Curated annotation (Swiss-Prot):
The lineage of its organism: Eukaryota, Metazoa, Chordata, Craniata, Vertebrata. Signal peptide: none annotated. It is found in: Cytoplasm; Cytoplasm, Cytoskeleton, Spindle; Cytoplasm, Cytoskeleton, Spindle pole. It comes from Rattus norvegicus (Rat). This is Proline/serine-rich coiled-coil protein 1. Residues 132-148, 175-186 have a biased composition (Polar residues). Belongs to the PSRC1 family. The modification Phosphothreonine is found at residue 145. The modification Phosphoserine is found at residues 22, 47, 65, 70, 124, 189.
Amino acid sequence: MEDLKEDIKFIVDETLDFGGLSPSDSHEEEDITVLVSPEKPLRRGLSHRSNPNAVAPALQGVRFSLGPLSPEKLEEILDEANRLAAQLEECALKDSENAAAGPGRPSPRGKPSPRRETFVLKDSPVRDLLPTVSSWSAPPPSNLTGLRSSDKKGSARAGRVTAGKKPSSIKKESPTCNLFSASKNPGRSPLAQPTLPPRRKTGSGARTVASPPIPVRPAPQSSASNSQCSSWLQGAAAKSSSRLPFPSAIPKPAIRMPLTGRSIPAGKGALAPDPLPTQKGHPSTVGHRAPVSQRTNLPTIGAARGRTSSAARGRVQPLRKAAVPGPTR
Protein backbone atom coordinates (compact mmCIF):
# COMPACT_ATOMS: atom_id res chain seq x y z
CA MET A 1 0.00 0.00 0.00
CA GLU A 2 2.84 2.36 0.84
CA ASP A 3 4.45 1.79 -2.56
CA LEU A 4 1.19 2.71 -4.32
CA LYS A 5 0.88 5.90 -2.31
CA GLU A 6 4.42 6.88 -3.24
CA ASP A 7 3.74 6.31 -6.96
CA ILE A 8 0.64 8.50 -6.96
CA LYS A 9 1.43 12.20 -7.13
CA PHE A 10 -0.99 15.04 -7.54
CA ILE A 11 -0.44 18.14 -9.61
CA VAL A 12 -0.54 20.31 -6.53
CA ASP A 13 2.32 18.38 -4.93
CA GLU A 14 4.56 18.47 -8.04
CA THR A 15 7.08 21.29 -8.56
CA LEU A 16 7.42 22.47 -12.16
CA ASP A 17 10.72 23.86 -13.40
CA PHE A 18 10.21 26.56 -16.12
CA GLY A 19 13.85 27.71 -16.28
CA GLY A 20 15.22 25.13 -18.67
CA LEU A 21 17.49 27.58 -20.52
CA SER A 22 19.35 28.81 -17.47
CA PRO A 23 22.98 27.61 -17.14
CA SER A 24 22.51 26.95 -13.44
CA ASP A 25 20.06 24.16 -14.12
CA SER A 26 22.53 22.33 -16.34
CA HIS A 27 25.09 22.34 -13.53
CA GLU A 28 22.57 20.98 -11.06
CA GLU A 29 21.69 18.06 -13.36
CA GLU A 30 25.24 16.79 -13.17
CA ASP A 31 24.82 15.92 -9.49
CA ILE A 32 21.54 14.07 -9.95
CA THR A 33 21.81 10.32 -10.12
CA VAL A 34 19.08 7.98 -11.06
CA LEU A 35 18.86 4.47 -9.75
CA VAL A 36 17.38 2.01 -12.24
CA SER A 37 16.21 -1.39 -11.13
CA PRO A 38 14.12 -4.12 -12.84
CA GLU A 39 11.38 -3.70 -10.28
CA LYS A 40 10.93 0.09 -10.71
CA PRO A 41 11.63 1.47 -14.23
CA LEU A 42 12.57 5.05 -15.01
CA ARG A 43 9.59 7.34 -14.50
CA ARG A 44 9.38 10.41 -16.69
CA GLY A 45 6.93 13.10 -15.73
CA LEU A 46 6.56 16.82 -16.10
CA SER A 47 8.92 17.46 -13.22
CA HIS A 48 11.76 15.38 -14.71
CA ARG A 49 13.82 16.13 -17.80
CA SER A 50 14.44 13.46 -20.39
CA ASN A 51 17.73 12.92 -22.13
CA PRO A 52 17.31 12.01 -25.86
CA ASN A 53 20.82 10.57 -26.02
CA ALA A 54 20.24 8.15 -23.16
CA VAL A 55 20.56 4.50 -24.07
CA ALA A 56 17.84 2.09 -23.07
CA PRO A 57 18.63 0.83 -19.59
CA ALA A 58 19.84 -2.70 -19.21
CA LEU A 59 18.41 -5.19 -16.83
CA GLN A 60 21.52 -5.12 -14.72
CA GLY A 61 21.85 -2.51 -12.06
CA VAL A 62 24.07 0.15 -13.70
CA ARG A 63 24.32 3.85 -12.91
CA PHE A 64 23.74 6.37 -15.76
CA SER A 65 24.59 10.03 -15.52
CA LEU A 66 22.29 12.63 -17.14
CA GLY A 67 24.93 15.15 -18.32
CA PRO A 68 26.04 16.87 -21.53
CA LEU A 69 27.01 14.85 -24.65
CA SER A 70 30.22 12.95 -24.57
CA PRO A 71 32.99 14.03 -26.97
CA GLU A 72 32.62 10.80 -28.99
CA LYS A 73 28.95 11.47 -29.66
CA LEU A 74 29.73 15.05 -30.60
CA GLU A 75 32.22 13.81 -33.19
CA GLU A 76 29.64 11.45 -34.66
CA ILE A 77 27.12 14.30 -34.93
CA LEU A 78 29.70 16.50 -36.70
CA ASP A 79 30.52 13.78 -39.20
CA GLU A 80 26.82 13.30 -39.98
CA ALA A 81 26.36 17.04 -40.51
CA ASN A 82 29.35 17.17 -42.85
CA ARG A 83 27.99 14.32 -44.95
CA LEU A 84 24.60 16.05 -45.28
CA ALA A 85 26.28 19.31 -46.31
CA ALA A 86 28.32 17.52 -48.98
CA GLN A 87 25.19 15.90 -50.40
CA LEU A 88 23.38 19.24 -50.55
CA GLU A 89 26.34 20.83 -52.38
CA GLU A 90 26.36 18.04 -54.95
CA CYS A 91 22.64 18.49 -55.60
CA ALA A 92 23.11 22.24 -56.03
CA LEU A 93 25.95 21.68 -58.51
CA LYS A 94 23.83 19.29 -60.58
CA ASP A 95 20.98 21.80 -60.76
CA SER A 96 23.32 24.55 -61.92
CA GLU A 97 24.80 22.32 -64.63
CA ASN A 98 21.34 21.41 -65.93
CA ALA A 99 20.34 25.06 -66.00
CA ALA A 100 23.48 25.94 -67.98
CA ALA A 101 22.89 23.12 -70.50
CA GLY A 102 19.23 24.04 -71.18
CA PRO A 103 18.59 27.79 -70.85
CA GLY A 104 14.98 27.52 -72.11
CA ARG A 105 14.06 24.95 -69.50
CA PRO A 106 12.13 26.49 -66.63
CA SER A 107 13.56 26.14 -63.15
CA PRO A 108 11.82 23.70 -60.80
CA ARG A 109 11.07 26.48 -58.34
CA GLY A 110 9.26 28.73 -60.80
CA LYS A 111 7.58 26.01 -62.85
CA PRO A 112 4.23 27.22 -64.24
CA SER A 113 1.08 25.16 -64.32
CA PRO A 114 0.92 22.45 -67.02
CA ARG A 115 -2.14 24.07 -68.59
CA ARG A 116 -0.14 27.16 -69.60
CA GLU A 117 2.72 25.26 -71.19
CA THR A 118 3.08 25.81 -74.94
CA PHE A 119 5.29 23.98 -77.39
CA VAL A 120 6.83 25.57 -80.50
CA LEU A 121 7.53 22.98 -83.20
CA LYS A 122 8.91 25.25 -85.93
CA ASP A 123 12.54 24.26 -85.36
CA SER A 124 11.91 20.92 -83.69
CA PRO A 125 13.27 17.73 -85.34
CA VAL A 126 10.10 15.90 -84.30
CA ARG A 127 7.98 18.10 -86.58
CA ASP A 128 8.40 15.74 -89.54
CA LEU A 129 6.98 12.84 -87.55
CA LEU A 130 3.78 14.69 -86.62
CA PRO A 131 0.73 14.73 -88.96
CA THR A 132 0.59 17.94 -90.97
CA VAL A 133 -2.59 19.65 -92.15
CA SER A 134 -2.28 22.16 -94.95
CA SER A 135 -4.17 25.45 -94.77
CA TRP A 136 -5.95 25.08 -98.13
CA SER A 137 -7.40 21.65 -97.30
CA ALA A 138 -9.28 22.90 -94.24
CA PRO A 139 -11.43 25.93 -95.23
CA PRO A 140 -13.22 27.95 -92.55
CA PRO A 141 -16.80 27.01 -91.64
CA SER A 142 -18.21 29.99 -93.56
CA ASN A 143 -16.65 28.69 -96.78
CA LEU A 144 -18.01 25.21 -96.06
CA THR A 145 -21.59 26.51 -95.93
CA GLY A 146 -21.04 28.42 -99.17
CA LEU A 147 -19.69 25.34 -100.89
CA ARG A 148 -22.61 23.22 -99.73
CA SER A 149 -25.17 25.74 -101.00
CA SER A 150 -23.39 26.02 -104.37
CA ASP A 151 -23.28 22.21 -104.69
CA LYS A 152 -27.01 21.99 -104.03
CA LYS A 153 -27.76 24.68 -106.62
CA GLY A 154 -25.53 22.99 -109.20
CA SER A 155 -27.19 19.60 -108.66
CA ALA A 156 -30.67 21.15 -108.93
CA ARG A 157 -29.73 22.89 -112.20
CA ALA A 158 -28.27 19.68 -113.61
CA GLY A 159 -31.47 17.82 -112.73
CA ARG A 160 -33.58 20.45 -114.49
CA VAL A 161 -31.41 20.35 -117.60
CA THR A 162 -31.53 16.57 -117.80
CA ALA A 163 -35.30 16.57 -117.24
CA GLY A 164 -35.82 19.23 -119.93
CA LYS A 165 -33.57 17.67 -122.55
CA LYS A 166 -34.40 14.46 -124.39
CA PRO A 167 -31.72 11.84 -124.92
CA SER A 168 -29.70 12.51 -128.04
CA SER A 169 -29.92 8.88 -129.12
CA ILE A 170 -33.65 9.21 -129.90
CA LYS A 171 -34.17 10.78 -133.32
CA LYS A 172 -37.08 13.08 -134.01
CA GLU A 173 -39.28 11.43 -136.60
CA SER A 174 -42.09 13.05 -138.52
CA PRO A 175 -45.60 11.50 -138.51
CA THR A 176 -45.23 10.64 -142.19
CA CYS A 177 -42.17 8.54 -141.52
CA ASN A 178 -44.06 6.82 -138.73
CA LEU A 179 -46.68 5.87 -141.28
CA PHE A 180 -44.03 4.21 -143.46
CA SER A 181 -42.65 2.29 -140.49
CA ALA A 182 -46.18 1.24 -139.60
CA SER A 183 -46.71 -0.12 -143.07
CA LYS A 184 -43.56 -2.20 -142.71
CA ASN A 185 -44.57 -3.59 -139.30
CA PRO A 186 -48.37 -3.81 -139.40
CA GLY A 187 -48.57 -5.96 -136.28
CA ARG A 188 -46.84 -3.52 -133.96
CA SER A 189 -48.01 -0.15 -135.29
CA PRO A 190 -51.30 1.33 -134.03
CA LEU A 191 -52.18 2.42 -137.59
CA ALA A 192 -52.48 -1.22 -138.69
CA GLN A 193 -56.02 -1.33 -137.24
CA PRO A 194 -58.68 0.44 -139.34
CA THR A 195 -59.64 3.70 -137.69
CA LEU A 196 -62.48 5.94 -138.85
CA PRO A 197 -62.50 9.72 -138.43
CA PRO A 198 -65.07 11.13 -136.00
CA ARG A 199 -68.64 11.65 -137.31
CA ARG A 200 -70.75 14.70 -136.71
CA LYS A 201 -74.51 15.32 -136.63
CA THR A 202 -76.12 17.58 -139.21
CA GLY A 203 -79.59 18.96 -139.37
CA SER A 204 -82.39 18.53 -136.87
CA GLY A 205 -82.15 14.76 -136.99
CA ALA A 206 -79.40 12.44 -135.83
CA ARG A 207 -78.17 11.42 -139.26
CA THR A 208 -74.47 10.56 -139.12
CA VAL A 209 -72.30 12.01 -141.84
CA ALA A 210 -68.68 11.01 -142.28
CA SER A 211 -66.32 13.93 -141.87
CA PRO A 212 -63.69 14.43 -144.55
CA PRO A 213 -60.22 13.07 -143.77
CA ILE A 214 -57.95 15.47 -141.95
CA PRO A 215 -54.84 16.22 -143.99
CA VAL A 216 -51.54 15.55 -142.22
CA ARG A 217 -48.78 18.04 -142.69
CA PRO A 218 -45.47 16.32 -143.38
CA ALA A 219 -42.38 17.45 -141.52
CA PRO A 220 -39.85 19.52 -143.50
CA GLN A 221 -37.65 16.86 -145.04
CA SER A 222 -36.12 16.14 -148.42
CA SER A 223 -38.22 16.52 -151.60
CA ALA A 224 -38.16 12.78 -152.35
CA SER A 225 -39.51 11.83 -148.93
CA ASN A 226 -42.20 14.54 -149.14
CA SER A 227 -43.42 13.31 -152.52
CA GLN A 228 -43.59 9.71 -151.29
CA CYS A 229 -45.44 10.68 -148.12
CA SER A 230 -47.96 12.86 -149.99
CA SER A 231 -48.71 10.14 -152.56
CA TRP A 232 -49.19 7.58 -149.83
CA LEU A 233 -51.50 9.90 -147.87
CA GLN A 234 -53.63 10.57 -150.95
CA GLY A 235 -54.01 6.86 -151.59
CA ALA A 236 -54.96 6.20 -147.97
CA ALA A 237 -57.49 9.06 -148.04
CA ALA A 238 -59.07 7.68 -151.21
CA LYS A 239 -59.44 4.23 -149.67
CA SER A 240 -60.90 5.58 -146.45
CA SER A 241 -63.36 7.82 -148.33
CA SER A 242 -64.58 4.83 -150.35
CA ARG A 243 -65.31 2.90 -147.18
CA LEU A 244 -66.72 5.72 -145.05
CA PRO A 245 -70.26 6.30 -146.46
CA PHE A 246 -71.68 3.27 -144.64
CA PRO A 247 -73.44 4.56 -141.52
CA SER A 248 -72.91 2.90 -138.18
CA ALA A 249 -75.49 0.45 -136.85
CA ILE A 250 -74.69 1.21 -133.20
CA PRO A 251 -77.77 2.86 -131.63
CA LYS A 252 -77.24 6.29 -130.17
CA PRO A 253 -78.42 6.95 -126.60
CA ALA A 254 -82.03 8.14 -126.48
CA ILE A 255 -81.13 11.17 -124.32
CA ARG A 256 -79.11 12.79 -127.11
CA MET A 257 -81.88 12.38 -129.70
CA PRO A 258 -83.97 15.55 -130.28
CA LEU A 259 -87.53 15.15 -129.08
CA THR A 260 -90.16 16.11 -131.69
CA GLY A 261 -93.91 15.89 -131.82
CA ARG A 262 -93.87 12.68 -133.86
CA SER A 263 -90.98 10.93 -132.06
CA ILE A 264 -91.52 8.47 -129.24
CA PRO A 265 -90.30 9.49 -125.72
CA ALA A 266 -86.93 8.10 -124.75
CA GLY A 267 -88.11 6.52 -121.53
CA LYS A 268 -90.66 4.22 -123.19
CA GLY A 269 -88.21 2.37 -125.39
CA ALA A 270 -86.63 2.44 -128.82
CA LEU A 271 -88.05 4.12 -131.94
CA ALA A 272 -90.62 2.32 -134.06
CA PRO A 273 -89.19 0.35 -136.98
CA ASP A 274 -89.77 1.56 -140.50
CA PRO A 275 -91.95 -0.90 -142.50
CA LEU A 276 -90.83 0.39 -145.90
CA PRO A 277 -87.52 -1.50 -146.09
CA THR A 278 -89.25 -4.80 -145.40
CA GLN A 279 -91.74 -4.21 -148.22
CA LYS A 280 -89.19 -3.16 -150.81
CA GLY A 281 -86.66 -5.74 -149.69
CA HIS A 282 -83.43 -3.90 -150.23
CA PRO A 283 -80.52 -6.27 -149.50
CA SER A 284 -77.86 -5.16 -147.04
CA THR A 285 -74.16 -4.90 -147.81
CA VAL A 286 -73.32 -7.74 -145.48
CA GLY A 287 -75.83 -10.04 -147.16
CA HIS A 288 -78.14 -10.68 -144.20
CA ARG A 289 -80.95 -8.69 -142.74
CA ALA A 290 -80.72 -7.52 -139.17
CA PRO A 291 -82.60 -9.69 -136.66
CA VAL A 292 -85.97 -8.61 -135.39
CA SER A 293 -84.61 -7.71 -131.95
CA GLN A 294 -82.06 -5.37 -133.49
CA ARG A 295 -84.52 -3.95 -136.02
CA THR A 296 -86.76 -2.75 -133.25
CA ASN A 297 -83.89 -1.10 -131.40
CA LEU A 298 -82.20 0.50 -134.42
CA PRO A 299 -82.91 4.22 -134.75
CA THR A 300 -84.31 4.89 -138.25
CA ILE A 301 -83.76 8.03 -140.16
CA GLY A 302 -87.49 8.44 -140.81
CA ALA A 303 -88.31 8.42 -137.09
CA ALA A 304 -85.45 10.79 -136.36
CA ARG A 305 -86.57 13.22 -139.00
CA GLY A 306 -90.10 13.91 -137.94
CA ARG A 307 -90.65 16.85 -140.26
CA THR A 308 -89.90 15.02 -143.56
CA SER A 309 -92.68 13.90 -145.83
CA SER A 310 -93.89 10.36 -146.39
CA ALA A 311 -92.44 10.34 -149.89
CA ALA A 312 -89.00 11.14 -148.53
CA ARG A 313 -89.35 8.27 -146.06
CA GLY A 314 -89.82 5.81 -148.90
CA ARG A 315 -86.70 6.96 -150.66
CA VAL A 316 -84.40 6.70 -147.62
CA GLN A 317 -82.78 3.33 -147.10
CA PRO A 318 -82.66 1.80 -143.58
CA LEU A 319 -79.53 1.72 -141.52
CA ARG A 320 -77.37 -1.26 -142.26
CA LYS A 321 -75.17 -3.22 -139.92
CA ALA A 322 -71.48 -2.44 -140.36
CA ALA A 323 -68.39 -3.74 -138.63
CA VAL A 324 -66.99 -1.17 -136.24
CA PRO A 325 -63.34 -1.52 -135.22
CA GLY A 326 -62.53 -1.75 -131.55
CA PRO A 327 -60.80 1.01 -129.64
CA THR A 328 -57.15 1.40 -130.50
CA ARG A 329 -54.61 1.26 -127.74
